[in-house]
Amino acid sequence: MVDEYLTADDFAGLSRGGLAEACLACSARLSPAFAAFATHSGPRDYDDLVRDLWACAGREVGARESEEFERRMEAFPEVGCDDSYLLDYYAMSVMGIPLEALHVLAGGGVERALACSRTALRLANEFSEKLDDENELWDAERQEQLRVIAGLKAGRHPTFDSCLASPVSRRLVEVLPAIVATQRAEQDEYLARIRHQE
């Protein structure tokens, strides 16, 4: 499946703003996952962050503004959770997508755009593994990334809301409740074992 990651050639011809919009589109499509897994942040917190980043597309984000966005991301309680048994771990993983988008806005170029694309695809793959068709979300996310890039090259700009209406986001909304319920049960069992050991 690694061979199916996007390459620099896929992004060729996009302006800095186009690269940023492609990355922000990934951030928006995975928004339902953050809302489903986050146990502390409100459901709109992530969306507001991505929308504010999107407002910067088309211009370079300076060092000071970039640091302000990074501090804002670091303030999310889920950030820093590195225990894959916990729900917050998956919310933290989603946050990696807008972080890469921020780096693109700050002038990170194609390499950061590729990192953003791969982060989104890895998450889609992780969720796909919990479904009967292990490639379903991966394939849908990959096709959506390519569709958005093609649209940008043709002068069509995605919006946060158009990304939420994508097949990927709609499918996530359908399958996430069951995935989260399973993960929550594993989390509760894990935490119970820890309490028992104490």
Language-model features: where?
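Structured binding/interaction patches within domain cores
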Residues: 2-154, 159
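Charge-dense, extended regions
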Residues: 148-198
